[in-house]
Amino acid sequence: MSDLRISEAFLYMDYLCFRALCCKGPPPARPEYDLVCIGLTGSGKTSLLSKLCSESPDSVVSTTGFSIKAVPFQNAILNVKELGGADNIRKYWSRYYQGSQGVIFVLDSASSEDDLETARNELHSALQHPQLCTLPFLILANHQDKPAARSVQEVKKYFELEPLARGKRWILQPCSLDDMEALKDSFSQLINLLEDHEAVRM
């Protein structure tokens, strides 16, 4: 091979290296989804979202009105609007539903029968609300680390999810602050539902 061809070969290799290092461009932006997070006071909404955002437990304060958190994942960013769950706040939930692309409903699986019935009624209302009924739902049975916690099967039966949510996109998962892997897996499943839902809409 002549010196000219060798020089051309080296120049071409230098060009390829330059393209790889300098012309790659920024990575594609992660998709963002706007979600609403609802559930009774004490269900653990704020604590779960703060944990996912790697915030200090000492900074967690129960939400009285609403708050918004950007929860980052490897393949998406979830902009979660968390609504307070007190009696005097729940009647205003529907005012904040517009623009949501998905729903997170958190329930206390170790709560009293009265609170569990209230949570069931609120979930039924959300599943049938005109602005939410077609959206993906992630239902989290929280506080699974407590002795009185009900299993996912018990929650599914009590909440009558099979007949009520038939034909809808929903996931029911157990969770607790002690099991972050399970919590992140639940949100990964939700992101898959969100991607599928947006693909169908497009």
From Swiss-Prot:
Name the positions where GTP binds: 39-46, 82-86, 142-145
InterPro entries, per the entry:
ARL15 (IPR042292), P-loop_NTPase (IPR027417), Small_GTPase_ARF/SAR (IPR006689)
Q: Could you state a single Gene Ontology molecular function term?
A: GTP binding
The protein's matches in SUPFAM superfamilies, at most eight in alphabetical order, are given as: P-loop containing nucleoside triphosphate hydrolases (SSF52540)
Where does the signal peptide begin and end? none
Q: Which Pfam families match?
A: Arf
Q: Is this entry keyworded Transcription regulation?
A: no
* Protein keywords: GTP-binding, Nucleotide-binding
- Family as reported in the entry's similarity comment: Belongs to the small GTPase superfamily. Arf family.
**Know the name of this protein?**
ADP-ribosylation factor-like protein 15
Native source organism of the sequence? Bos taurus (Bovine)
The organism's taxonomy opens as:
Eukaryota, Metazoa, Chordata, Craniata, Vertebrata
